Amino acid sequence: MTRKDILKEVLSLEGNNWLLELPTGTGKSKIALEKVKSLGGKTLLLVVNRNVHKQNWTDEIKKWWSNCNMKITMTTYVSLPKYAGKYDCAIFDEAHHLSERCREALCSFDIKHSILLSATVSNKLKDELIEVFDDLTLYKKDLRDVIENDILPDPKVYILPLNLRADFPTEVIMKNPKAKGKLIESSWALRWSYMKQKTNPVRVHCTQRQYITDLDNQIEYWKKRYLRSRSEIFKNKWLRLCNDRLKWLSDKKTPYVQQILIHLGEYRTLIFCNSIEQTEMLGEYCINSKNKESIEHLEAFNEGKIDHITACNILNEGMNLCNCQVGIYANLNSSDTIVKQRMGRLLRHKNPVIIVPYFKNTREEELVNKMLENYNPKLVTIIDDYKKIKI
């Protein structure tokens, strides 16, 4: 199987609506444009996740269909309802963003042919899409399939287990932060002497390991409350704490990632970060939603003018990277979709390398074990020192 074989199979698909579930890096944009080209028509609706992704599609159209004379309407999922009307064709990029609001809005659209693109779509969403798009044809290729067929390269993976500090109280936990009384300073050992009272705020000094233990306990508490009550308030509290935990763990890896960067030297590197602040801490050329120079940095990277970029969310999907060899996961994510999308950012290099530092005996360890299911075990190396990384 080759890219040409996939394209040939997609072009031969009959019907009016198609969901193409293809790994990032297989050329979904080109395949979709070729399908639209084969259908004919005069109007095309192109829906993307973010405004910044519009330029990527503009470049793809120039590259693969320079003589296109269709009238193209480009919008985001947020603005989709504003563009209700009649179209010959529609491309829904990253179709897993077709929310209930967007699906309801499609009742006001008259679209002859729809092409839905995504790297991963949940079974629940597939069922919902089948209800919206008449006779939806599903076409899927798994990531391992395309790697084993040499369409995408098999990445070399370095796993670097780390330990949270348990020897010195470097962290602070605030209890009763809204209380109006005098602030109480407490050690970890004495915390229960003060935490049951609600009059005074308590600042507990603790180690990194103790901090994550407290956070784990809070998460378990709110999870149980939600499972008993099904209260949306409790659910939101539980999920917010889960996000806080991953962000905190990611922040604690910043100095380790900085050491890895120094070790790698001039290899072309992308760092997946948890926040805008972390992108700024880990690199001069950061790509995030607040940086007005993000597109310029991306273009400079693709042109080979710079070798290191950092990103927060914006590069998970919908953006092309040229010749990026090394990916460092400063931030881990529980979403299988994001895991596969990030991997696809790197598989455009012929010898990709993925580096995953994580803290042992934390939620991160569970996520790493899940990630390993996507990798060739023969190419996975567990190291105890970043200096053992060899590109």
Label the predicted regions.
Residues 97-157:
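Post-DEXD/H (motif II) to motif III coupling segment of the RecA-like Helicase ATP-binding lobe
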Residues 47, 51-86:
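Inter-Walker segment of RecA-like/P-loop motor cores
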Residues 345-373:
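Conserved segment of the helicase C-terminal RecA-like domain
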Residues 24-61, 125, 276-277:
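Conserved Walker A/P-loop ATP-binding site and its immediately adjacent core
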Residues 87-91, 308-312, 316-333, 338, ...:
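A short beta-strand element within the Helicase C-terminal
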